[in-house]
Amino acid sequence: MKKILFLSALIVGTSFFATAQKEYKLQYSFKKGDTYEWSQSASSKQHIVGPGFDQNNETVVKTNAVMKIMEVTPKGAKFEIEYTKLSTSTSNPQTNIQMDSEGDTAKNLPNKIMRAMKGKKFNFTLTKDGAVESIENVENLWSGLTAANGFNETQIVTMKQSLENSFGKNAIKLNLEVAMVRYPEHKIKVGLNWNSKTETGTPIPLKTENVWTLESAEDPAATVVADGQITTTDTTKVITLPPGLRATTNFKGRRVVKSHINLGTGWPETSRAYAEQKGFMVLLAGGQIPEDMKMDVDVNIDAEYAIKKK
């Protein structure tokens, strides 16, 4: 009986050890012509305190897009992407603006602008490891904002400035990087970590040092978590904010992303991201700003992403 018990324990222990030690080579699979539906829902809440004021701002962005693989390369793939639905809402003590590509455009200029951005194609490249290497032809998003479509020059300039933070090149790259899991070059086991780094300007120059973990894996699915430390890369860099204000920034924070992936294809199916940043910006003297003005800023961002192959 003791021998039987010993053999049973040995079999169970060996089975557990084999399962725990299983290795996975995580990477994206690409095929020319494959098409994916991508959806994003993100909210950003800002608490700003400055000389004589205390203000809360909130921005909500929701988009649906179609991504098509146009070319497969040894390193990855080149995609063509276009928005099929866009909406944003911005609220603060001074204003409340709703913009919806599916809303009435006859009397609503913001809706008309969103509608004009639908179907405008641009490109990005993605490596097998999940690095977003380039964003190209983003200027096509604004190609519908023309006099022929009923927009005057002032409207075009003003709206492009206000939408740059959500739909500019840097913002799009950041959203793709958060939605796409970054994989290691080597094989990985459950519970082990790997690192990646991203740098973006939105327009604030930020760097995120990510520690990724394969939290769980059971064919055909797995869960991956990224825990990232956010810092400002250049606290002396002067950035431009709407409507033409100049400022320097200094932020630190944390971003956590949890993604459910397909082990066979490497593609994330759903992702949830949360980020918090704290610090300050200094509005530089000039125009309506008589002297440098320091403002303490807290930012909380909550975002969800979903990707589905058509």
Residues covered by each model-derived region:
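Bacterial Sec-dependent N-terminal signal peptides
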Residues: 1-26
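Signature of exported/secreted
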Residues: 21-310
